[in-house]
Amino acid sequence: MVVGASGGTGSALVRELLRRGRRVRAINRSGRLNAPPGVEVAAGDARDAERMREVCRGAGVVYNTVNVPFTQWRESFPAAVDGVLAGARAASATMVFADDTWMYGRVTGPMTEGLPYRPVSDKGVLRAWLAERVIAAHSSGQVATVIGRAPELYGPAVESLLGRNLFGPALTHGPALWVGELDQPLGPMFVEDFAHGLAELGEHEAALGRAWHLPTPEPITAQAFLDLLSAQVHRPVRVLRLGERSARTLGLVWPVAREGAEMLYQFSQPHTVDASAYTTTFGPGQVTPYAQGIAHTVDWYSTTARRSFLRIGR
């Protein structure tokens, strides 16, 4: 079962589970979803624990891919995590939690799962607290849980700093928005690869009770990523680059920029993950080359009208 099935990660995970031959129930707040044939769709707000207990009934694995706009994190995210935990616990199911790397803060070198949580942002503090809550539920015997982590995501329907602000303008001849530096090594993850890794974690008892970093391609600089995007759209992509000061200034009139400004450190220093624990235990995973992932993303944006600057959230 996938909770948060309307988002980029959730919709990719629905497709991945179908490819694996699994029966899939997709949950979003409206109960309306353009899902592939064979998918059961139901309405449910992750913050409503009683509803989560109802929709999780009969599930063996519950994938929590819920995310909300930055501006609603503090008020909505904890309740959403608790609600899905309650549903998984009632069903005696495993809960797989889709996570990021914001809890580590500023680091030097590739991030490993053994790093201490030293968040430098409010959202990183919340991510650390949520992760601890998810693992504590497992350690206390309430419900089996596992966490899959990705750095910044990109791909079809992904709402991130590498989402509509970048790909939408590239297709409409507008300036693409890039935050941070252009010459630092990054490890963006294609959303289909994230979905593959999450699905894999849900199938192995050996994965339970901890967080795993999922595999990405070799690091790439922002400029090289933009060059690949330019090649895909057959013209140089114009870029509006925002540093921390300009993002905070823009935040005076644009709440998304205000909320996102504290995360710019990720794009102003090397930001990569070490997934060797995962690959040693489960194999190489699915790792899509950047050129291929960018091509798939451009194809998706070329057939959707949702190209304006977005709210940001996975």
For each predicted feature, which ranges?
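Conserved beta-loop-beta element that borders a ligand/cofactor-binding pocket
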Residues: 100, 132-157
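Substrate-positioning beta->alpha
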Residues: 158-165, 179-202, 209-213
